[in-house]
UniProtKB/Swiss-Prot annotation:
Taxonomic path: Eukaryota, Metazoa, Chordata, Craniata, Vertebrata
UniProt name for this protein: Mini-chromosome maintenance complex-binding protein
Keywords: Cell cycle, Cell division, DNA replication, Mitosis, Nucleus, Phosphoprotein
Chain positions with Phosphoserine modification: S154, S167, S298
InterPro entries: MCM_complex-bd
Disulfide-bonded cysteines: none
Location relative to the cell: Nucleus
Similarity annotation: Belongs to the MCMBP family.
Name of a matching Pfam family: MCM_bind
Record flagged with keyword Protease: no
Subunit (UniProt): Interacts with the MCM complex: associates with the MCM3-7 complex which lacks MCM2, while it does not interact with the MCM complex when MCM2 is present (MCM2-7 complex). Interacts with the RPA complex, when composed of all RPA1, RPA2 and RPA3 components, but not with RPA1 or RPA2 alone.
List of residues that carry Phosphothreonine: T160
UniProt-annotated stretches for the region Disordered: 151-200
Ranges annotated as biased composition (Polar residues): 151-161
Length: 642
């Protein structure tokens, strides 16, 4: 373990040291960031940092150094806080400067008072993100992160393990101050807030107000607090994330790994209740709006903890089996990629066999499923996303559990996914599109608020005849826009705002999908298992965990390979296409060339090749010919269904 645990258990002490050494000059802030950067470069140091994703909140010590893997669900307005404030000793009149950065509560020592009029005080600005665990994150990803984390935590002196059993609306008396900290602040006399920081009150008063918290919250939080997760059934903490540097680099739906100071001070809930009570003196309508916004933006810290970010990194992916950043020219990353690429061919062959079994013996469909799973939007030309490869797997057995179990297979392979059951009822009732709630001043999530590289499986096999109402029509249109343009238009009431995305969409259907797709492959099962669940479970249990991990690395890594076509290859492809048009002018179009190039691109990448060879071009033509022939055969059997 890295030598010394102060940076983990008492990061604010480290910050205080730099502040004391450097005074109010900007140097101290940079030195703090550099210090923690260097600490995290030490051998396995990130694994020693407790993670809010894996460790229950009641096991984490307040004001300790933590990490959090999350998605930015919303961005609140910037807020001002006391960057530097001054206290005065009532007896000696000695003045002391304190830093307000990385804090929600201004600390006052014994016999000290906060000087609100000090000319040495400074006001600074910070940005607040509302962050949630990565939507749709696969169970194998969570388990891998848990197994890799070496942080040793036990229930803190501030929490008890039974705390998490309390209902959301209760934030009753619970002393969150370690004994040591209580002694330090026993002389404080004030309570209140200024510039984003609250200052601590008399301990007896604190305990009295905390004991009345249950009554206050039963009035103000009469309904359970909505954590605003995009997907149903999601678990884990939501956090208010305070960002101090470079917040313009981040945007909604970015996936981040954050390192910072955990703040769960109960005085936040107490003072927020006081502010809500005070707002009752205002105009009733204005009071209602303000109370709702206050409730959403300042929830109980025991339910939505705060993280004061020291370091933040935007994640390219969340696959724990790969290096975090795949673009850096680091020796370890290069070595990892080189080693894996050397054994790519057998991994692809095994994956093809595995997916062939999952697709009931259909090896052609398995080929296209591999191409789909490694596809990604690599650039945009005007509004057109290049690299998307939405596949419609038609011919799926109706009234069967096949699509459900196929999705389970995909869940075991990709880091994040979601299955949307496309029924008339769901289309009419589900909230797919995020919308702005102006009363609470927040972005209310929808099912399509997903991070990049999520696999979205739309299951049409349950779709029956029925009437779509207006919300249903809007939802279907939203899915079509997502597939065609790789964007979701968020609803801001008075206008729509485009949010570009990079979502892999697989549509399973009986006939041709109602939704647009880049490629339709009709399933031709070679076997129909009498017990689908038993068959699929047997398929999963037969794969060694080490082999399954290779599949996971393969599907993530190939998305990040660069791919280029030389002028010679481009000319050869164009000449070949001209010959194809001569031989079959009626059925070969420019769209067919585009489709062939997309298939050839991902076919090459699936073999670890970053440019197109003649062999891969011929193989792409062969695959496309087989796929089209199959569709024609099916069309002649079923009329115009396909």
């Amino acid at each position: 373990m890295p030598c010394g645990e102060d940076w983990l258990s008492h990061p604010l002490g480290i910050v205080q040291g730099f502040f004391a050494q450097n005074g109010v000059t900007p140097d101290w802030e940079k030195k703090v960031i550099d210090y923690f950067k260097e600490k995290l470069k030490e051998n396995n140091a990130p694994k020693w940092v407790p993670s809010l994703n894996e460790v229950p909140l009641h096991y984490l010590k307040p004001n300790s150094f933590v990490k959090f893997r999350c998605m930015i669900q919303d961005m609140f307005d910037p807020e001002f806080y006391m960057g530097v404030y001054e206290t005065v000793n009532q007896n000696t009149k000695a003045r002391v400067l304190h830093f307000g950065k990385y804090r929600d509560v201004a600390e006052c020592g014994p016999q000290q008072e906060l000087d609100l009029n000090s000319p040495r005080s400074t006001t600074s600005e910070r940005q607040t993100f509302y962050c949630v665990p990565v939507p749709g994150e696969s169970l194998w990803v969570k388990e891998a992160y848990v197994n890799a984390n070496q942080a040793r935590v036990s229930p803190s002196t501030s929490y008890t393990p039974s705390r998490h059993k309390r209902s959301y609306e209760d934030d009753e008396d619970m002393d969150l101050q370690p004994n040591k900290q209580k002694d330090q602040h026993s002389g404080a006399r004030q309570a209140g807030g200024l510039g984003g920081l609250h200052w601590r009150g008399e301990p007896k008063r604190l305990e009295t107000e905390a004991s009345s918290g249950q009554q206050l919250n039963s009035l103000n939080l009469s309904s359970p607090f909505d954590l605003n997760f995009p997907l149903p059934g999601e678990k884990g903490p939501a956090c208010l994330v305070k960002v101090y540097e470079d917040w313009d680099c981040f945007k909604v739906n970015d996936v981040l790994e954050l390192y910072g100071v955990l703040s769960v001070d109960p005085i936040l809930s107490i003072l927020n209740n006081e502010e809500r009570d005070a707002s009752a003196l205002l105009d009733p309508m204005e009071c209602t709006d303000m109370a709702e916004e206050q409730r959403v933006h300042s929830p109980p810290a025991s339910l939505v903890p705060r993280i004061h970010v020291i370091l933040a990194q935007k994640l390219q992916h969340i696959n724990p089996l790969l290096p975090t950043c795949l673009n850096k020219e680091e020796s370890r990353t290069c070595q990892f990629v080189s080693n894996f690429m050397s054994e790519l061919s057998p991994v692809r062959a095994e994956l093809l066999g595995f997916l062939t079994h999952a697709l009931l013996g259909d090896s052609l469909a398995a080929e296209y499923l591999i191409l789909h799973l490694i596809s990604t939007v690599y650039t945009r030309r005007d509004v057109l996303p290049l690299g998307k490869f939405t596949v419609n797997l038609s011919g799926c057995p109706q009234n069967s559990t096949f699509t459900e179990h196929l999705y389970r297979i995909i869940q075991h392979l990709v880091p994040a996914s979601f299955r949307l059951q496309m029924t008339i009822e769901n289309m009419n009732q589900l909230k797919l599109i995020p919308h702005k709630d102006y009363t609470a001043n927040r972005l209310v999530s929808g099912l399509l608020q997903l991070p990049n590289n999520t696999s979205l499986v739309i299951d049409e096999t349950l779709l029956e005849q029925g009437q779509l109402d207006t919300p249903g029509v809007h939802n279907v249109a939203a899915l079509s826009n997502l597939i065609t343009w790789q964007k979701v238009d968020y609803d801001f009431s008075y206008h729509q705002m485009e949010f570009p995305c990079n979502i892999n969409v697989l549509i399973t259907s009986e006939g041709r999908s109602l939704l647009p797709a880049d490629c339709q492959i009709h399933l031709q099962p070679q076997l129909i298992p009498p017990n689908m669940e038993e068959y699929m479970n047997g398929l999963l249990s037969a794969v060694l965990p080490s082999v399954l991990n290779k599949f996971r690395i393969y599907l993530t890594l190939l998305r990040f390979l660069d791919y280029n076509l030389s002028d010679d290859i481009t000319k050869a492809v164009e000449d070949d296409f001209v010959e194809m048009r001569k031989n079959d002018p009626q059925s070969i179009t420019a769209d067919d060339l585009h489709q062939l190039l997309v298939v050839a691109r991902f076919l090459s990448l699936s073999a670890g090749q970053t440019t197109l060879s003649r062999e891969r071009w011929l193989r792409a033509k062969q695959l496309e010919h087989s796929r089209r022939s199959r569709l024609q055969q099916q069309k002649s059997v079923n009329g115009n269904e396909l």
